[in-house]
Amino acid sequence: MRTVKALLVIPLMTAVTTMTATAQPPPAPASLRLYVFDCGRLEGGDVSRFRLAPQEMATTDMSVACYLVVHPNGTLIWDAGAVPDSDIERANANGTSRRYRLVLPNGAERFVTATRTLKSQLAAAGYTPDGITYLALSHYHYDHTANANLFAASTWLVRPVEREAMFESKPPDLLQPSTYSALRRSTVIAITGADYDVFRDGTVVLKSSPGHTPGHQVLFVKLAKTGPVVVCGDLYHYPEERTLNRIPTFDADEKQTAASRAALDVFLKQTGAQLWIQHDFSANAKLKKAPGYYE
């Protein structure tokens, strides 16, 4: 694997030659769009891991959301869900609400209720996985990577420390390597700075926010009508983490998490951006879903 200085680029030699013919995507919009996909409902389980108690919370369940950013100069998928599309297809359950049991490599079990494949939701918006320009994951945990392999032909925007951990011989807990194994051969832009301006116009920015994982990042989207939005990955899981100032026990570095949250608070005040907590079940339920979009 060849690396290049600065923003490291790891070429995927077969991306163009092996890509299958697909339907043409919709014409590029005149202004930025943000699509929200329903990628399931994750049962929270033991919330003491988040230093919370059930009686302090509106719900212990979490939404699992994925997002598509459509820019006049390209597209970006943000996070890839918890249940692989292949599991839904194998159960012949696309369009049917079904509870899935996920078993992680360390033997831990998680339960997610999902209804539709990510591919079918993309298709409803007019897109296919192999037509997406960029893939960016907030971080490497299983409930954000389930369909990452679908986007192996996209350019992967990732921080080196995160990528290295994903392909270690013994990856950290809460990873599901089979869901992202194809990314090993993907074209990579390795982000070495705090911010990465995806389309070079300030409207779509990946911001470093380490702590939950070493290379965790959040997504800033500057929408013309909706206004600026920060989609925060797992910097917070529950809104009560924010209001009660609780940090999960399993974060890689709690001091980094606290610093990242403080830095984001400053950024939110400076920009007036809304904070979208991806796992906030109640808030996510109120968001319009694809094929509707925010602009």
Predicted regions and their residues:
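Active-site gating loops and adjacent loop-to-helix segments of metal-dependent hydrolytic enzymes
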Residues: 91-108, 237-245, 251, 292-294
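Metallo-beta-lactamase
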Residues: 19-131, 159-208, 226-233, 256-274, ...
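Active-site metal-binding motif and surrounding structural segment of the metallo-beta-lactamase
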Residues: 91-158
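Bacterial N-terminal signal peptides
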Residues: 7-18
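Positively charged n-region of N-terminal signal peptides that target proteins for export
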Residues: 1-6
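Short, electropositive alpha-helical surface patch
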Residues: 137, 285-295
